[in-house]
Each structure stands twice: as structure tokens, then as C-alpha cells.
Amino acid sequence: MAIKKYKPTSNGRRGMTVLDFSEITTDQPEKSLLAPLKKRAGRNNQGKITVRHQGGGHKRQYRIIDFKRDKDGIPGRVATIEYDPNRSANIALINYADGEKRYIIAPKNLKVGMEIMSGPDADIKIGNALPLENIPVGTLVHNIELKPGRGGQLVRAAGTSAQVLGKEGKYVIVRLASGEVRMILGKCRATVGEVGNEQHELVNIGKAGRARWLGIRPTVRGSVMNPVDHPHGGGEGKAPIGRKSPMTPWGKPTLGYKTRKKKNKSDKFIIRRRKK
């Protein structure tokens, strides 16, 4: 999809960009694959804020996505490419030969009318899902499982992809979108191709109101708070932090401080850490 720019007719329009949605083929989602989505506004079951800067925004319905891709041996045809308000990637509606309909994350260059397949014997073709051990070295993949049968958890955002680098015993070596190189069980499934909507990262929201439509609330600087609310707070006027390093609102060091557990069980699967 192309990026659409606006003339600076107002301060809010100046610099604002939007996607032209030229790849989207319908604005009517499949009703059987919709579920209600209640707003949590970043609160947990006690009503406490566990994720800051969330709340409000346009009402949404959840699209039920097939992350498992476990419909083996049954061909499916792409019926539509649709917008999904709950993720950065677009989604594709697949009509299978047995009459079932499912949504999948739409890979780059997937078009209406194309046929896709899942299973160990599927061809190496965009949109096909198969175990990593059956995918040739050098292939770009997305929607990767970490545990067989659990469903894809890695590489699902718009424009992302991972690359199969090699095979070692029952494990496959994959370079993820972050630059991390890790081993994943060969039985875990992945989908061939890159995730579509790669222009998403170039969109400039442009104004605060548009962020609120998306359910994003303001981010307040710690230095303008009171000491009771933030370690950077207090003082007269524009006071310095007054600490050795910047802190999170909960008093932990930030900006470069490592928060990963020292003895994480998954360390043995990571060959190279992600790029900083």
C-alpha cells in the first residue's frame, strides 16, 4: 500500500500521513469470525493500571485469526484482504474446499484468488504453512510457533520476517526480525513469506486526537510529576533528575539497564542476542 500525504491546511494536517488501503478488497468482515472485545483501558481484574497510556479509542470487534494453521491437506482460496483494527498487519479471509472459512495474517504479495495449503507436504509458496524442518535454508518466514501445536507467536507484525539459517539435529536455526538468532524445534510450524502492509511503520499519526482514536493516551514526563508519583518528580522549576541514572516510575534503572532474568531457561536456545 502507498502512503498518502496531506497539504498543511492545519497544524494537525501538517506532516500527517495515512495508508491508501489500496490492497483492502472489502470493508465488511466475515460475521462468523467476529467476537466481542471489551475495553480494559490497561486495568487488571482489580482495576489497577498494569499498562500505562491505554484507554478510550474507537469501538472494535475481535477477528478470530488462525495462528495454528492446522488445516492440513485441504486447499484454501483467498477470498478477501481486510483491515484488522487489532493489529498492524492486514488479514486474509480463506475459503477452504470443505466449506470452512478462516482468517490468516496476510503475507506480502498474497492476492485474492490465490490458493494456499497447510501441512508437511505443502509447497514452498507464499502463504503456505509447514514445519520449519521442511522449509529450505534461506527462506523468509513469519507466524512462527515456539511449541508445536500452540500456534504462531513470533514475527506477526506488519512488514516483519524471519530467515531460516540452518538445521541442527531436531532444531532449526532462525534469524528473527529483531536480529536475534535462535534455535526452534523443527516440528514447529511457520508460514512462508513476509508479513504484508510493510508501509505501516512510515505512517505519521500527525496529531494527538488521532492517537486517541487508536486508544493511546498521553505519556506524561516524570520530571513534571510530584516526588510521590515518580523518582524524577519534585524540585523547583526544571530540576535535574538528581539520581545517578534515569529511573522508571517504580524506581528501577532504565535506558540501557538489563531486565532479562540472569538464568532464563530459554538462554540455551539463543545463539546471538538481538541487536541493540
Curated annotation (Swiss-Prot):
Key words, A-Z: Ribonucleoprotein, Ribosomal protein, RNA-binding, rRNA-binding
Composition bias type Basic residues, residue spans: 258-276
Entry GO CC: large ribosomal subunit
Biological processes per GO annotation: cytoplasmic translation
Chain residue ranges for the region called Disordered: 224-276
Domain of life: Bacteria
Coiled-coil zones: none
MF terms (GO), sorted A to Z: rRNA binding; structural constituent of ribosome; transferase activity
Complex formation: Part of the 50S ribosomal subunit. Forms a bridge to the 30S subunit in the 70S ribosome.
NCBIfam families: rplB_bact (TIGR01171)
Name of this protein: Large ribosomal subunit protein uL2
